[in-house]
């Protein structure tokens, strides 16, 4: 009960505390062996400390001068006894407040009853004030930062947008959105819309032009015959349609795509750089994605020689390579088949420009765990197990193309590049961190 009283009383006291006066709050616990009232407690405090501490610390004089606040008392009487608290606000320094608190414990009578006074604590009121100040300052600081960041970001964004808008130009008869370098650059990047051009401008790429839909403008058709063209498209069906239209009416040298399901206008700087760095030559892109009809039509229309009709010898030797069986053969059969394959095709040919034939060969080599090296005419120079590929290529740097049934690793790319290899075809890509621009790397899952 005393606890409840003291808590509620504390609220009352804090409302009466003068914040300009109080430094410390003396909390004295009171016990009497009889029933007393509040005026008895206040009278005992003033009466029994009078003259005890000298004139400088006389409670009446201190209260008149404002150095001691109003004494608040909360007591409760039960079963002939009284307990409670007295709270004394002090504007004195630490030493004087401590002396005053100690003097209160000399009180031995309150009214007609024996009494005992104990100092429960002396609380530094300024600590709570400081804590409130800290909490409030944190909130104010957070609000300031939030508004400041918003303002800063807004200013930067506004300036950037204005700069980008001032840089974008209208090009050609169709007034196509384009970057300011479109007139002078030997290579151009063809994108879908105005926002794509703006996004690339934001990261300093200025040789861009937008087709504004699937109907390729005459301006872009003309530019494609004069410049090196990279088609940089969204990773969705719309990008596929624009690419097909581009192949039918214009020319393209490389293809770069946004990640599946994303648009060029959404890409970050890192994503843009990665996509353009690993752009794929148009013929390799079409073959890799199974667009054989488009590849054939594109090649014929642009008078390109992409592969040749296989002669009878090629067909006969290609038939030796069979599709891998559904059930893997026993180890003895694998070794025998591997030996036969190497023997029969030691002097064989592979149409390296025929994606279907290359794919079949990779599947067969994956079953055999073998790697083969071919010259530029598609004639096989030698073959060896996948595990020996890096060592064998570094020891005998011959050939133009590697076809492997294993994983294309970074080490294999590095060694092949040093050996003068131009193409690597494989089943899967390992962890690739860099690829020289002079070597083509194609896996049937993805390409670099």
UniProtKB/Swiss-Prot annotation:
Manner of cofactor binding, per the entry note: Binds two Mg(2+) per subunit.
Catalysed reaction, written as an equation: ssDNA + n NTP = ssDNA/pppN(pN)n-1 hybrid + (n-1) diphosphate
Record-linked InterPro entries: DnaG_primase (IPR050219), Primase_DnaG_arc (IPR020607), TOPRIM_DnaG/twinkle (IPR034154), TOPRIM_dom (IPR006171)
Enzyme Commission (EC) number: 2.7.7.101
Basic and acidic residues compositional bias, start-end: 329-338
This protein's GO CC annotations: cytoplasm; DNA-directed RNA polymerase complex; exosome (RNase complex); primosome complex
Biological process terms in GO annotation: DNA replication, synthesis of primer
Binding site for Mg(2+) 2: 234, 236
Cofactor(s) essential for the protein: Mg(2+)
Source taxon at top rank: Archaea
Molecular function in Gene Ontology: DNA-directed RNA polymerase activity; metal ion binding; poly(A) binding
Enzyme class: transferase
Biological function: RNA polymerase that catalyzes the synthesis of short RNA molecules used as primers for DNA polymerase during DNA replication. Also part of the exosome, which is a complex involved in RNA degradation. Acts as a poly(A)-binding protein that enhances the interaction between heteromeric, adenine-rich transcripts and the exosome.
HAMAP family, A to Z: DNA_primase_DnaG_arc
Annotated family: Belongs to the archaeal DnaG primase family.
Subunit structure: Forms a ternary complex with MCM helicase and DNA. Component of the archaeal exosome complex.
The protein, known as: DNA primase DnaG
Species this protein is from: Thermoplasma acidophilum (strain ATCC 25905 / DSM 1728 / JCM 9062 / NBRC 15155 / AMRC-C165)
Gene: dnaG
């Amino acid at each position: 009960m005393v606890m409840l009283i003291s808590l509620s009383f504390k609220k009352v006291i804090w409302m009466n505390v003068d914040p300009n006066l109080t430094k410390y709050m003396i909390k004295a616990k009171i016990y009497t062996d009889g029933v007393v009232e509040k005026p008895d407690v206040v009278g005992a405090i003033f009466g029994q400390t009078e003259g005890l501490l000298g004139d400088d610390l006389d409670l009446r004089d201190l209260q008149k001068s404002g150095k001691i606040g109003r004494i608040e008392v909360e007591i409760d009487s039960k079963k002939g006894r009284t307990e409670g608290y007295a709270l004394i606000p002090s504007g004195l320094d630490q030493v004087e407040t401590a002396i005053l608190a100690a003097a209160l414990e000399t009180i031995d009578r309150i009214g007609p009853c024996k009494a005992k006074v104990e100092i429960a604590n002396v609380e530094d009121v300024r600590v709570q004030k400081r804590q409130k100040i800290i909490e409030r300052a944190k909130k104010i600081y957070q609000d300031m930062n939030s508004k400041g960041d918003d303002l800063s970001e807004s200013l930067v964004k506004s300036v950037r947008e204005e700069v980008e808008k001032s840089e974008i130009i209208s090009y050609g008869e169709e007034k196509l959105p384009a970057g300011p370098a479109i007139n002078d650059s030997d290579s151009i990047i063809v994108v879908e819309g105005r926002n794509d051009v703006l996004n690339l401008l934001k990261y300093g790429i200025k040789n861009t032009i937008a087709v504004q839909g699937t109907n390729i403008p005459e301006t872009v058709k003309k530019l494609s015959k004069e410049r090196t063209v990279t088609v940089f498209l969204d990773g969705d069906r719309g990008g596929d349609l624009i690419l097909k239209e581009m192949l039918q009416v214009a020319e393209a040298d490389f293809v770069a795509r946004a990640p599946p399901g994303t648009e060029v206008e959404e890409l970050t700087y890192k994503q843009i750089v990665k996509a353009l760095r690993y752009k794929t030559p148009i013929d390799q892109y079409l073959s890799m994605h199974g667009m054989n009809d488009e590849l054939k039509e594109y090649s014929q229309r642009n008078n390109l020689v992409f592969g040749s009709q296989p002669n009878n010898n090629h067909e006969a030797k290609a038939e030796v390579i069979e599709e891998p069986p559904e059930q893997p053969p026993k180890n003895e059969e694998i070794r025998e088949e591997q030996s036969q394959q190497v023997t029969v095709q030691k002097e064989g040919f592979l149409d390296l420009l025929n994606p279907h034939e290359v794919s079949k060969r990779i599947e067969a080599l994956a079953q055999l765990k073998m790697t083969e090296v071919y010259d530029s005419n598609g004639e096989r120079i030698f073959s060896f197990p996948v595990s020996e590929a890096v060592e064998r290529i570094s020891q005998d740097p011959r050939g133009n193309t590697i076809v492997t049934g294993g994983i294309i690793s970074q080490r294999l790319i590095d060694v092949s590049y040093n050996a003068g290899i131009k193409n690597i075809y494989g089943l899967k890509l390992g962890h690739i961190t860099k690829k020289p621009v002079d070597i083509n790397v194609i896996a049937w899952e993805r390409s670099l």
